[in-house]
C-alpha cells in the first residue's frame, strides 16, 4: 500500500504545472525542498470525544509518513493526546484536567498508550519509532539542547521516526493547550528541520471567524509576523481562537521562522492530511527568514559568550567551507564554561570568526586543544564527540 501511495503522489506532482508548484504552499514541504520535516498533531485530531484514538485516521497519517520516508524525507512527529487517553483509562473527569495532579497522572498512563499506538501503526508500515518526552525547558538549557539535537540526528540517520510529546507527567506550567505548537517549533529549530506543519481543526489563520463572518478570508502566506497578525490570533479577536489556539500557533510560527524554518498551519480534519496538504497547499504558510541575521540573532545576539576559542588558519578556512571545528585546529582556550555554553571563535589576530555551542567544558576543552580526533578518548577517559563545535551549532560572523 505504501508503494501505491508513493506512486499516486508522484503522479499528482508530475501533473502540476510549474506555476502551480511555485504558488503552492505544500510544495515548500515536499521531500525535494524539505529534507527534514516536523509535523505536529493535536489532541482534538488524534482523540475523539470518547477519549479513544481515531485509529483509521491516524493510520492514514502513518501511511503518509511511510511514503515520504520512502521518498527520502526524514520526519519527526510531535504528538499530543497522552492526557486525553490516560484520563479515559482512569475514568477521570474533565478529560483529566480537573487538577494538576489529575493531568499528571493521566499523562503518565497515557504516554504508554500513545507510544504503543504510534509504534503499532508505524510498524505496520515497516517503520521503527522512538519516544522522546520533553518540556520547553529542556530546549532552553543549552547542554540538554545539544543532547536532544544529537539524539534526533542519530535516530533520523538510522531511519527511525521520533515521536515527541511534552513530559506532562512532571511538567507544571507546560500543561495547557497549545504548548505542543511551541514545542514543535523548538524541535524544528533543534533538529535543523526545513519545515514544521501544525495540523489543526482549522485550515489556517483567518482575518475573522469564518463560522461567524461570511467575509472572513484565509491568509495563505505570511512573510512577516507583525501586530496585525497577532491581532487576528488574539483571544479577543473575531477569529475567536483564544490564547490556547491560534495565538500559540502564531507564536510557534515566530519561533520557527525566526530560526530559518518554514511553518504551515493546515487542517487535519481529512484522511491522509499530510499528502493532501502537499498536494493542495490549503493553509497558511509562514515563510522562514533565510537571512544570515536571523541565525545570528538567535545564536549570537541573544546569548552571552562564556569563553574564547582561538584557532589556526587551517581551521578558519575549514569553518568557512562549512565544516565543524575539530580540536586539532584549536590553538588555545580562554574562559570558564560548561558544555553547551556559547563561546566565541577567533583567529590568531583575535578577529571574531564565529560563535557556537561548545561540546565540552573548559577543562576538557583545554586538555584536547590541538589533539587529533583519535586521541580524544584516551585523553579524556571516555568516548566523546569528534567535534569541539558542530557546524549545526555554529554561526559565522
From Swiss-Prot:
Coiled coil, from the record: none
Iron keyword on record: no
Domain PUA, chain residue ranges per copy: 306-383
Binding site for ATP: 40, 200-201, 243-249
Cited PROSITE patterns: GLUTAMATE_5_KINASE (PS00902), PUA (PS50890)
Subcellular location field: Cytoplasm
InterPro entries the record matches: AceGlu_kinase-like_sf (IPR036393), Asp/Glu/Uridylate_kinase (IPR001048), G5K_ProB (IPR041739), Glu/AcGlu_kinase (IPR001057), Glu_5kinase (IPR011529), Glu_5kinase/COase_Synthase (IPR005715), Glutamate_5-kinase_CS (IPR019797), PUA (IPR002478)
Residues that bind substrate: 80, 168, 180
One GO MF term attached to the UniProt entry: glutamate 5-kinase activity
Pathway: Amino-acid biosynthesis; L-proline biosynthesis; L-glutamate 5-semialdehyde from L-glutamate: step 1/2
Reaction(s) catalysed (UniProt annotation): L-glutamate + ATP = L-glutamyl 5-phosphate + ADP
SMART domains per the UniProt record, alphabetical: PUA
Amino-acid biosynthesis listed as a keyword: yes
GO cellular component: cytosol
GO biological process: L-proline biosynthetic process
Keywords: Amino-acid biosynthesis, ATP-binding, Cytoplasm, Kinase, Nucleotide-binding, Proline biosynthesis, Transferase
Stretch list, region Disordered: 1-28
EC numbers for this chain: 2.7.2.11
Enzyme class: transferase
Principal location class: cytoplasm
Family recorded in the similarity comment: Belongs to the glutamate 5-kinase family.
Reported function: Catalyzes the transfer of a phosphate group to glutamate to form L-glutamate 5-phosphate.
Protein name: Glutamate 5-kinase
Taxonomic source organism: Zymomonas mobilis subsp. mobilis (strain ATCC 31821 / ZM4 / CP4)
UniProt gene name: proB
Amino acid at each position: 500500500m505504501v508503494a501505491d501511495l508513493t506512486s499516486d503522489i508522484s503522479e499528482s506532482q508530475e501533473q502540476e504545472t510549474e506555476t502551480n508548484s511555485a504558488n503552492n504552499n505544500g510544495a515548500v514541504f515536499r521531500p525535494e525542498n524539505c529534507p527534514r520535516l516536523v509535523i505536529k498533531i493535536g489532541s482534538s485530531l488524534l482523540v475523539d470525544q470518547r477519549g479513544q484514538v481515531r485509529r483509521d485516521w491516524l493510520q492514514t497519517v502513518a501511511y503518509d509518513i511511510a511514503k515520504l520516508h520512502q521518498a527520502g524525507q526524514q520526519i519527526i512527529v510531535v504528538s499530543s493526546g497522552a492526557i486525553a487517553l490516560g484520563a479515559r483509562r482512569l475514568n477521570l473527569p474533565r478529560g483529566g484536567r480537573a487538577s494538576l495532579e489529575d493531568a499528571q497522572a493521566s499523562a503518565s498512563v497515557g504516554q504508554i498508550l500513545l507510544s504503543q499506538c504510534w509504534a503499532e501503526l508505524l510498524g505496520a508500515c515497516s517503520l521503527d519509532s522512538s519516544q522522546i518526552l520533553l518540556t520547553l525547558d529542556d530546549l532552553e538549557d543549552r547542554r540538554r539542547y545539544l543532547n536532544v539535537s544529537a539524539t534526533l540526528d542519530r535516530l533520523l540517520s538510522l531511519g527511525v521516526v521520533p515521536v515527541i510529546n511534552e513530559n506532562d507527567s512532571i511538567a507544571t506550567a507546560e500543561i495547557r493547550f497549545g504548548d505542543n505548537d511551541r514545542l514543535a517549533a523548538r524541535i524544528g529549530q533543534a533538529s535543523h528541520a526545513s519545515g514544521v506543519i501544525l495540523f489543526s481543526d482549522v485550515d489556517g489563520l483567518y482575518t475573522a471567524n469564518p463560522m461567524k463572518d461570511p467575509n472572513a478570508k484565509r491568509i495563505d502566506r505570511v512573510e512577516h509576523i507583525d501586530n496585525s497578525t497577532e491581532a487576528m490570533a488574539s483571544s479577543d479577536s473575531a477569529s475567536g481562537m483564544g490564547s490556547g489556539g491560534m495565538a500559540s500557533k502564531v507564536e510557534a510560527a515566530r519561533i520557527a521562522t525566526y530560526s530559518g524554518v518554514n511553518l504551515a498551519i493546515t487542517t487535519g480534519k481529512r484522511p491522509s492530511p499530510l499528502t493532501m496538504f502537499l498536494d493542495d497547499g490549503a493553509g497558511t504558510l509562514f515563510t522562514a527568514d533565510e537571512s544570515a541575521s536571523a541565525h545570528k540573532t538567535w545564536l549570537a545576539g541573544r546569548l552571552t559568550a562564556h569563553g574564547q576559542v582561538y584557532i589556526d588558519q587551517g581551521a578558519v578556512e575549514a569553518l568557512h567551507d562549512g565544516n565543524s571545528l575539530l580540536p586539532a585546529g584549536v590553538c588555545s582556550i580562554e574562559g570558564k564554561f560548561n558544555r553547551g555554553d556559547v563561546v566565541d571563535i577567533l583567529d590568531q589576530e583575535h578577529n571574531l570568526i564565529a560563535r557556537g555551542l561548545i561540546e565540552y567544558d573548559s577543562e576538557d576543552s583545554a586538555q584536547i586543544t590541538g589533539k587529533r580526533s583519535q586521541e580524544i578518548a584516551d585523553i579524556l577517559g571516555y568516548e566523546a564527540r569528534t567535534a569541539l563545535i558542530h557546524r549545526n551549532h555554529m554561526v559565522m560572523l
